[in-house]
Amino acid sequence: MKNLDKYLTLLDGDVDGLLLTSRYSRHYGAEFDIAEGVAIVTKKGCRYFTDSRYIESAEKNLKGFEVLDVNREIGYIQRLNTAIADFGVTTLGYEEHYLTAEEYFHYAEKLNAKLVPFHKPIYAFRATKEDWELELMRKAQAITDRAFAEVITRIKPGMTELELQAELIYCMYKNGGTGLAFDPIVVSGPNTSLPHGVAGERVIQKGDFVTMDFGASYMGYCSDMTRTVAVGYATDEMKHVYDTVLKAQLTAIAATKAGVPGKDIDGTARKVIADAGYGEYFGHGYGHSLGLEIHENPSPNASNTEPLPAGVVCSAEPGIYLPGKFGVRIEDVTIITEDGCEDITGSPKNLIIL
């Protein structure tokens, strides 16, 4: 079933049309990414509106949509209201998760159809991935693995975090990335105790841990990985913390399969870290799912009591962060299957000392 056909199955109940305003939902339905635009989906027809910057690409690549331009004379509201009239739409399901209050009130006031919150049904199709989506995500992760293998040859004492971040971004594009899944995190020394620290002018030194959290995207689909490496040498404490994080990750991956609640997977990793005496230093969730967005749902974390289905792609990223000293995080991307999970990250997980 094509993605657009999946959206059409939602039109048998509370709504007779879908208003797609998020880039991700438009990408999913049209199976092609256009940065700006709005789409309407009905059983009588589907239209995609965008401006002159993207119209040629949209006309060439979008599947299943009539493509129309918006300009100074004819804007989105006029295009939408024409479609509403042409297709006899009375109720439009909209993506409340992606609209600001200002945008919602604008649509609610101007459109000639009732707006119904409909984010969850629209979003639900993206939770589990089709085989072709998994193939794109494998390609994205392979690109990220190649970038890691290259960038670690460039890490040297004396370079700054920002310089390393620039090298990392270059390596992702050089190795085939069509974009970045997110802005990379590159931190060193005591800054590695900041789970989402920001690269700065700090100079990398011998004896530092360096943590890199990064991911290339490929044709819109994300990858995500984190590796912590040591420069020159690692102390016994650094090695012990690293080994603890790795054990937590491997134990949780082994416990992951379809039907297991997200909180149980999170709890498996958390118990390993707590038993080693570092429980208070693992503050974030074990992982998140990903796809067209870097953070999706459902996720393997403590707040998710629902069983995870096969076909969900999720990160596995426990960490320990000792304030003012150092931190360690190891992250892979896994695909949940009926009898386990497939780790699609190919980079080594043993402690690398450069």
Task: For each feature predicted by the language model, list its residue ranges.
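Active-site neighborhoods and metal-handling regions in enzymes and metal-associated proteins
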Residues: M1-L354
